[in-house]
Amino acid sequence: MDTIAIPALNRPVDATVEIPGSKSITNRALLVAALAQGDSTLENALFSEDSEYFAKCVEQLGIPITLHPHLAQIQVSGKGGDIPAKQADLFVGLAGTAARFITALVALGNGEYRLDGVPRMRERPMGDLVTVLQNSGITINFEGNSGFMPYTIYGQQFAGGHFRLKANQTSQQLSALLMIAPYAQQDTTIEVEGTLVSQSYVKMTCRLMADFGVDVTQTDDNQFHIKAGQRYQARHYTIEPDASNASYFFAAAAVTGGRVRVNHLTKQSCQGDILWLNVLEQMGCQVIEGADYTEVIGPEQLQGIDIDMNDMSDLVQTLGAIAPYASSPVIIRNVEHIRYKETERIRAVVTELRRLGVKVEEFADGMKIEPTPITPAAIETYHDHRMAMAFAVTGLKTPGIVIQDPGCTAKTFPDYFTRFFKMID
């Protein structure tokens, strides 16, 4: 297995970095551009395993896509809600967003579409999304466990109507249904039962739909209403840098008492993970916002924090990786749903912190991390890109940290370590 040794610094980080486009926005923009009528150009698009799996699936459905990786640009020739391909065998790898978005997209088609992914993807929940589609009259045949991949969808144009959806494990199912709803045969109302996790991603979805010309009405009781007959408008669209991926660079400033500036990303971002800046401020960092950049300056000593991370759960690993350096405990709450991500993320973070000698208490929905001197170790990443990226930051403060399988970052940030080492050069 490949490994990367992280060189500990005896000085603060001082760098300005450029972050590739947001994965979440790239995938949403790609879907709505595919449904629009005409040609759209997506600038600063993310090119990674996840986004490329998604783009390939859309192209297999008969919607022309031209990728320009050197320009970070994707051109999409949308078909106005039509799915030209009547049969397709679609592979999504470990891309949960692609799995759920493509599942919804093919419901608009009139054909036979098989979806599958890697073994871990077969363990990730799809149940409520496929149940809504079945309740709308679409036939789905499961090859294994009901509600899980692989399965075949027999599309017949999504009917729309009134549906109830549980979104306590992932909000991607809700986002998928929202984005196809304008092309349903009738108005659609989606009522979310119980707690909606990662609400910030749903807000991102609604904002992007509006950017492409479609209105969503949300009531206070977590009901979403979309009128049928609305259509996305093809357009030129620039994608923000990825706030989740920026978190590791901001964390490097925090943990070394240094300075990191990320260009083209501000607190006005539509990404929920921009809330990471608030977390760092509460831990003692100074956050400076310019017209088109954000800068974090780390303190001499990080402070502990007790925080609900439900709306920024992709950052649990980032916080976990710097928490041992705080002056008091760090408590992370309300993220039970991350047990169903690329790996069982709560258990993975707890296990690797304990490997480093850190005192950690695991909860059903989070953890408590005590300030602890760290023992050097090789970090197991569990094929999870965020484990590799987060614990690389730990290595800036403590000598002897080695990241196993660093190539797993290709899922969302292929040149992460190139940019990481440039930051500390």
Swiss-Prot record:
SUPFAM superfamilies reported for this sequence: EPT/RTPC-like (SSF55205)
Record's keyword annotation contains Transferase: yes
An annotated GO cellular component: cytoplasm
Location of the protein in the cell: Cytoplasm
Binding of phosphoenolpyruvate, residues: 23, 96, 124, 172, 345, 386, 411
First-tier enzyme category under EC: transferase
Active site: 314
Swiss-Prot/TrEMBL GO biological process terms: amino acid biosynthetic process; aromatic amino acid family biosynthetic process; chorismate biosynthetic process
Binding positions for 3-phosphoshikimate per the UniProt entry: 23-24, 28, 170-172, 198, 314, 341
Subunit-level organization: Monomer.
Family as reported in the entry's similarity comment: Belongs to the EPSP synthase family.
Protein name, as recorded: 3-phosphoshikimate 1-carboxyvinyltransferase
Organism: Nostoc sp. (strain PCC 7120 / SAG 25.82 / UTEX 2576)
Name of encoding gene: aroA
